[in-house]
Amino acid sequence: MSNAHHDAFDKATKAGFIIALGIVYGDIGTSPLYTMQSLVDNQGGLSQVSEAFILGSVSLIIWTLTLVTTIKYVLIALKADNHHEGGIFSLFTLVRRMSRWLIIPAMLGGATLLSDGALTPAVTVTSAIEGLKAVPELSSIYQNQTNVILTTLLILMVLFGLQRFGTGVIGKLFGPVMLVWFSVLGISGLLNSLQHLEILKAINPYYALHLLVSPENHRGIFILGSIFLATTGAEALYSDLGHVGRGNIYASWPFVKVCIILSYCGQAAWILAHKDSGIALNPFFASVPEGLRVYLVILATLAAIIASQALISGSFTLVSEAMRLKIFPLFKITYPGANLGQLYIPVINWSLFAVTSCTVLYFRTSAHMEAAYGLAITITMLMTTILLAYYLIKEGVKPLLASLLMAFFAFIEFIFFLASAVKFMHGGYVVVVLALAIVFVMVIWHAGTVIVAKYVKSLSLNDYKHQIKLLRDDLRFDLYQTNVVYLTNRMKKDLIDRSILYSILDKRPKRAQVYWFVNVRVTDEPYTATYKVDMLGTDYIVCVELYLGFRMPQTVPRYLRTIVQDLMESGRLPKQVQDYTITPGREVGDFRFVIIEERVSYARQLSTLERFVMQTKASIKHVTASPMRWFGLQYSEATVEVVPLLLSDVLKLPIKEIKACTKDEKA
């Protein structure tokens, strides 16, 4: 990585500042929409709150944002970039060689973050639309919650429907809109706070600690379940590191944090002034003059859409990284924009839409959604903390110091987890069940890969290259193709799967001029595209190690075209002059790609559990992207050959021949 690129990553610019507002802070920036309302509702309404309760609540929010978001994520986690990419899978990539078991927190964290993504668009958009109840001209329409639901579903349908076209153009508006949003949060919060300056006492952590044991807090420690809503976007902040750079996050976070805290203080000041009024409105909207509320609702809806968009895009990135790490099924990926980082996964998009829509229909109100929201993300944060401890040790921090530091954050997050656990019975089970389903798929997929690696046998190409040469020159067999390309995910030096040689020599001898063996290796760097070639001292066997970054499309034919030209230009591969062609001067023959697909056969070596894993993985494959699509072979000549997982395990079953009796035997 060049120093110039590294400097740009750590540099803050005015444009980067604006872009960061639109990409990084959507989730945490829309938390003021519902956090204070959740606190008031769980306390029993405005009439049940006191000054001590409000001061303590705001103090808890301020110190949660400081300890968890600022110190853990902004100051520590952002240092853990994998070639300028952030997020739990990038963090796992940095430390996975330190211990095999670290894949467990990576899977749990990724699954819970993905499941949380199904709830965030639902709660943010619903909260924004419910703000129309505070607009006198529209309150009569939106007092009917069905109209809120229908409007929310319409917005979500349009949002998810537009994903296939990318967000290149409209994405440029995200930053300016969020700049206005945060400015409004800060200004309105400041104006309201000036009416009750005593709210500034909330900066003192004493009020936060006192509230946890105060009898004025009706929910005790479980109030932290609502407090945690203020920092749910911290994990997304880390995940979006690669999109905007560390320097721009460092520059923009102080502004964002101040605006958010001012908003909470302003809402708290309004609550103190109206706690005896009996008003049943969201403090966020009620704290703004009636004449401005409709504009605030429009702005809040735009902010909610931007937050949802950032989360949807983040889900695509998360899934694509899991695929590259071979812990998630392969789904079709398209790139609607010019930027490789802007991707679209149809299956994930419409699955998210279905789950999000069902969430809106099931919970109906944002209050009910808030009761279920946040449980999954506490698990994600705990898993990130575990991985961060290993990262700090890897970077030279003394193990004891790293363990103590991360234990401090783990303690805080575990308390939040316990406080949020009560949400399980109030709808939190929805995201937990979804997360468990995702974990199940990840475990099956990863375990299946491990089982195949355990049982598949490898053979040396050097031991068979003489046979391959004889086959190439054996005119008794028709030419199968000029170039035959075998795609394999297991190749080490001259060792390849036995099933590949079985396909070439045994199944039906495949005569070709050149035999290619291509292994795609996913690198820790996001945008790598390099290769190594070993021809084993021949001009008819080419072993290619293709190194692609975890965010690069694995369109093998495009890369192979360049590799062929390089080899011919360097004289290592003979030119394949074509007598019949519509392309004058064509020097490359035709290609056929062969993919070997292992299937579970009757195999005594496989345990019952291993057989279950392999059969389940085979079932999952029915809804995943085919190897043809994944490797970009839709427009190439390609063949999928099915072979038993264990070629050596075609067992001789006990069976006896019934012989005809001779005359002597009959006598």
Curated annotation (Swiss-Prot):
Asked whether the UniProt record includes Cell membrane among its keywords, one would answer yes
According to its UniProt record, which reaction does this protein catalyse?
K(+)(in) + H(+)(in) = K(+)(out) + H(+)(out)
Which Pfam families does the annotation name?
K_trans, K_trans_C
- Where do the TM regions start and end? 16-36, 58-78, 101-121, 146-166, 167-187, 221-241, 253-273, 294-314, 343-363, 373-393, 399-419, 431-451
Regarding the membrane, this protein is recorded as: Multi-pass membrane protein
Q: Give the GO molecular function terms.
A: potassium ion transmembrane transporter activity; symporter activity
Give the location in the cell: Cell membrane
What keywords sit in the KW lines? Cell membrane, Ion transport, Membrane, Potassium, Potassium transport, Symport, Transmembrane, Transmembrane helix, Transport
Q: Which InterPro entries match?
A: K+_transporter, K_trans_C, K_trans_N, Kup
What GO CC terms are in its UniProt record?
plasma membrane
Transmembrane: present as a keyword of the record? yes
What this protein is reported to do is described as: Transport of potassium into the cell. Likely operates as a K(+):H(+) symporter.
Q: Which family does it belong to?
A: Belongs to the HAK/KUP transporter (TC 2.A.72) family.
Could you identify this protein by its name?
Probable potassium transport system protein Kup
Q: Which organism is it from?
A: Streptococcus equi subsp. zooepidemicus (strain H70)
Q: What is the lineage of its organism?
A: Bacteria, Bacillati, Bacillota, Bacilli, Lactobacillales
Gene symbol? kup
